[in-house]
């Protein structure tokens, strides 16, 4: 039982710390930079570039108001389910520390972006609750692809602008791929 309490505390700490880091960065960018402004952090390959994303990854959106509302509600539902699932599995003693940390990073990233959608429109006066935009700022235009390169020629290798929450989700999901054995072993044990 003691191990379950430690894992629960670990999950809560990872989520709280990651969400706080995400929100501090976003609020600083939102209040100190103009939309579209770029600041060089390291040369021309690590930039802060402030954009607001109304959709999901890479600016993909699902229509106007109804699409934004459905996206926000979907995000909330997924986070609710994942939170229930992770903490239930911790209580059952079914997850290792690495799996808990990585799952918590995914949850923290999702929560960080939900906070933007829920409240930023209201706080900054541009949209009602659930209709806010996600603040993105990290930009790594690593190198320019040659013009002859198929489809993406003349564009930067990594053109996405993203935020800390997106990084948490990505690192968490990639890391969880290495822990899939935990889930497979768990299923074998249940049969």
Where are these regions (language model features)?
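Alpha-helical transmembrane bundles and membrane-interface segments of multipass inner-membrane proteins
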Residues: 1-191
């Amino acid at each position: 039982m003691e191990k379950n309490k430690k894992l629960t505390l670990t999950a809560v700490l990872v989520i709280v710390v990651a969400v706080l880091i995400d929100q501090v960065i976003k609020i600083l960018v939102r209040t100190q930079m103009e939309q579209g402004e770029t600041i060089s952090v390291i040369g021309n390959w690590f930039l802060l570039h402030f954009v607001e994303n109304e959709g999901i990854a890479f600016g993909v959106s699902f229509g106007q108001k109804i699409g934004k509302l459905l996206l926000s509600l979907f995000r909330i539902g997924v986070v609710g389910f994942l939170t229930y699932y992770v903490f239930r599995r911790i209580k059952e003693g079914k997850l290792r520390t690495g799996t808990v940390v990585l799952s918590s990073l995914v949850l923290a990233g999702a929560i960080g972006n939900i906070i933007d959608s829920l409240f930023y429109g209201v706080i900054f006066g541009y949209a009602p609750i659930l209709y806010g935009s996600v603040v993105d700022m990290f930009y790594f235009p690593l190198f320019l692809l040659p013009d002859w390169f198929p489809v993406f020629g003349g564009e930067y290798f990594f053109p996405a602008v993203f935020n800390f929450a997106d990084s948490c989700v990505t690192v968490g999901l990639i890391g969880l791929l290495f822990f899939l054995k935990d889930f497979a072993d768990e299923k074998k044990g249940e049969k």
